[in-house]
Amino acid sequence: MAVIAFIGLGQMGSPMASNLLKQGHQLSVFDVNPDAVQRLVDKGAQPASSPAQATIGAEFVITMLPNGDLVRSVLFGEQGVCETLSREALVIDMSTIHPLQTDNLIADMQSKGFSMMDVPIGRTSDNAITGTLLLLAGGTAEQVERATPVLMAMGNELVNTGGPGMGIRVKLINNYMSIALNALSAEAAVLCEALGLSFDVALKVMSGTAAGKGHFTTTWPNKVMKGDLSPAFMIDLAHKDLGIALDVANQLHVPMPLGAASREVYNLARAAGRGREDWSAILEQVRISAGLTANVKK
């Protein structure tokens, strides 16, 4: 079993640390909230008065903190991790922070001769409690292999995301999709209600279409990602249908800001001459708008 310093015992960190204890790992814990520390001490952890004290003798140092500035302070600040960190130890940041902060932290740790990887998590606090988190491992092959037994005490699925800093990048994209879709789904649900439509009926229909399953796993793999823009559903028709939905919403005084923004993306594609292409060609149009090279020639 490993000797671990765990720093950051919030809503996610506390149950994650608890699961490490359940698997027999030796934990030293630190948090600015003494009550959070005491709850882990009651379960068998050793309390620490600072990140530096927690790190003494640790093989792994896990940080689970609210933002990148705090991670930097914990690592490099007064009584920080680096004051007592062994050159053989591995630092694992599991916080959700800005990817560029992650890159800088890893580079700064490497410049001091230390090893660090990022492993942000997916799923919810309930999964943190049950030890069924999704672990997005960003590190070298050696780091991922070494950390896996410790990480799997906190989760049941580990994805090697392809190198240092890649974990937080895929977490960022996943959260962006989830959060934006949550708002778009709310617009659709309220429009259902305003139209007098049973939400259960709408849910049954959408669960079998791209609306419920998502384009990453339905339309895109079969069309644009194969280099095929022949229309299964034309952008012109998608634009028309979206316009009808927005017109109905306007008449019912239902705000649809995300839907309106989406229509402008389809307008852009039509202006670029893509109206008769498959609606998955939106991906290509957004790539071009971002200054990237199109993958599929028109």
From Swiss-Prot:
Membrane-spanning parts: none
InterPro entries: 3-OH-isobutyrate_DH-rel_CS (IPR002204), 6-PGluconate_DH-like_C_sf (IPR008927), 6PGD_dom2 (IPR013328), 6PGDH_NADP-bd (IPR006115), HIBADH-like_NADP-bd (IPR029154), HIBADH-related (IPR015815), NAD(P)-bd_dom_sf (IPR036291), SLA_reductase (IPR030876)
Enzyme Commission numbers on file: 1.1.1.373
Keyword terms, alphabetized: NAD, Oxidoreductase
Catalytic reaction(s) noted: (2S)-3-sulfopropanediol + NAD(+) = (2S)-3-sulfolactaldehyde + NADH + H(+)
Residues given in the record as 2,3-dihydroxypropane-1-sulfonate binding sites: 123, 174-178
One GO-annotated biological process of the protein: 6-sulfoquinovose(1-) catabolic process
Residues where NAD(+) binds: 11-12, 31, 65, 96, 240
Active site as annotated: 171
Enzyme class: oxidoreductase
A molecular-function term among this protein's GO annotations: NADP binding
Pfam families documented for this protein: NAD_binding_11, NAD_binding_2
PANTHER family referenced in this protein's UniProt entry, alphabetically: 3-HYDROXYISOBUTYRATE DEHYDROGENASE, MITOCHONDRIAL, 3-HYDROXYISOBUTYRATE DEHYDROGENASE-RELATED
Role this protein plays: Reduces 3-sulfolactaldehyde (SLA) to 2,3-dihydroxypropane 1-sulfonate (DHPS).
Family, per entry: Belongs to the HIBADH-related family. 3-sulfolactaldehyde reductase subfamily.
Name of the protein described by the UniProt record: 3-sulfolactaldehyde reductase
UniProt source species: Salmonella typhimurium (strain LT2 / SGSC1412 / ATCC 700720)
